[in-house]
Amino acid sequence: VVVQNGTIQKLGVNYRVAMNLGIPVSTYEFSDQKDRIWLAQNSEIMRQDTNAIWEARKDIPFTDDQREKVEALYQAKVQGNTWKNFVRKWQSTPREGGGDVANRLGLDDRPVALLATNVLGDSLTLGRQVFSETMAEWIEKTVQFFAQRSDVQLVIRVHPGEVLTHGPSMVDVVNKSVANLPENIHLVGPRDQVNTYDLIDIADIGLVYTTTTGLEMAMSGLPVVVAGITHYKGNGFTHDPQSYEDYYKVLNRLLQDPKNHRLNKRQIDQAWHYAYIFFFEYAV
């Protein structure tokens, strides 16, 4: 059986029925690149299980040419552009510089945590729980944590892709988390003209559920806390708590001295190497 996606709606039903009947199932989904797909055997492709390819490739030297390809792709994404056969983009707002964005948001010199959301109900969020019941619950508890920490700042970047959907917005989840957002919490909505990569430049730590922005934060040297099950966690360049207790401990430790917890050169290089494998070799 060949099934697209294998996670959502009737596609998920087809996948699970075939698996329960012992029928081999191939799942696929269209990747970020034109004329290429992601492909999995007997698993949901949107799990993006890269363990096998990463284990096979991680000890092969990462060449300068490969890094240049990742850099070219990354710079295109930073500017809100497509690159070669990579045709998908989630934002078109050009960069204006981290300093200008910080001033516009009213940020000061207190440490900044950047929380980047996924789109609720997207295949990349379904069944990805580690210690929270849902992504929305994790966001709510994170907002409540920072509401009690006036010594630090939280910027929440709601996924720009929400403008293409009709479901609940993470804007509503954030606003319902506390009675009134305190001055140290700043909400950037999906339609707000703010470049996410300017926010990465401002940030001291990153907080993500499963979004690929977490990988890009690590490529920039930020310590990244991953709350959900995503393909790039567990590879030595992210913090991966297994409970809320662990999560709060990691947050407190990183926020106490974020600059001392920036990734070292080996970890940054590893993140870049992984990005090459994921963006250029994982799709077929």
PLM features: what roles do these ranges have?
Residues 7-12, 33-36, 121-125, 161-166, ...:
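Flexible loop/turn segments at secondary-structure boundaries
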Residues 79-176:
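Conserved catalytic-core segment of nucleotide-activated headgroup transferases in glycan assembly
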Residues 10-12, 29, 192-239:
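A donor-sugar binding/catalytic signature common to diverse glycosyltransferases
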Residues 152, 184-186, 238:
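Short, conserved active-site loop motifs that form the nucleotide-linked donor/cofactor pocket
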Residues 129-130, 166-215:
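Donor nucleotide-activated moiety binding/catalytic core segment of transferases
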Residues 102-105, 109, 149, 237, ...:
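Long, C-terminal catalytic modules of enzymes
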Residues 16-93, 250-258:
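Active-site-proximal region of nucleotide-activated glycan assembly enzymes
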Residues 1-7:
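Short N-terminal targeting/anchoring amphipathic segment
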